[in-house]
Amino acid sequence: MAKKIQAYIKLQVKAGQANPSPPVGPALGQHGVNIMEFCKAFNARTQGMEPGLPTPVIITVYSDRSFTFETKSTPASVLLKKAAGISSGSSRPNTQKVGTVNRAQLEEIAKAKQADLTAADLEAAVRTIAGSARSMGLNVEGV
């Protein structure tokens, strides 16, 4: 018989830098999960990623206090800010532009995000990422 699911926990943890401090510790502790076991497993799985990039993770906690987790790709907004060399998006995106991204950068981000996007092909994924860039106040060249 399958294990009974107790909870789903959604967190954003920096790749390779999970530790028992907030937000990881309290979120897992209230469900009785072994926090250090999760931290070690998460850090091992994200070892190949660039350290420090926020990585969304969905943790499934079962009634016997065991868990499984699934990592997603880094949010598009973080990748766009990194590509444009800015620290935050515009507070007025339609009037005040804070940076520029080109087609090659958008394609690179779309390839990294394609598994998590619902886009049918790379071109649709590029358009989706370009829309995210515009909503952050970035100029988009070549799309």
Swiss-Prot record:
Q: How does it assemble?
A: Part of the ribosomal stalk of the 50S ribosomal subunit. Interacts with L10 and the large rRNA to form the base of the stalk. L10 forms an elongated spine to which L12 dimers bind in a sequential fashion forming a multimeric L10(L12)X complex.
A Pfam family of the record is: Ribosomal_L11
Please cite one Gene Ontology biological process associated with this protein: translation
Similarity field? Belongs to the universal ribosomal protein uL11 family.
Name the PANTHER family for this protein. Answer: 60S RIBOSOMAL PROTEIN L12 (PTHR11661), LARGE RIBOSOMAL SUBUNIT PROTEIN UL11M (PTHR11661:SF1)
Q: Could you tell me what this protein is called?
A: Large ribosomal subunit protein uL11
Query: Which SMART domains does the record match to this protein?
Result: RL11
- Which top-level group of life is the source organism from? Bacteria
Q: Does the keyword rRNA-binding apply?
A: yes
A cellular component annotation (GO) from this entry: cytosolic large ribosomal subunit
Record-level Gene Ontology MF annotations: large ribosomal subunit rRNA binding; structural constituent of ribosome
Native source organism of the sequence = Azotobacter vinelandii (strain DJ / ATCC BAA-1303)
Q: How is it modified after translation?
A: One or more lysine residues are methylated.
Q: Does the keyword rRNA-binding apply?
A: yes
Which segment of the chain is annotated as a signal peptide?
A: none
Function, as annotated, reads: Forms part of the ribosomal stalk which helps the ribosome interact with GTP-bound translation factors.
Keywords on record: Methylation, Ribonucleoprotein, Ribosomal protein, RNA-binding, rRNA-binding
> Where do transmembrane segments lie in this chain?
none
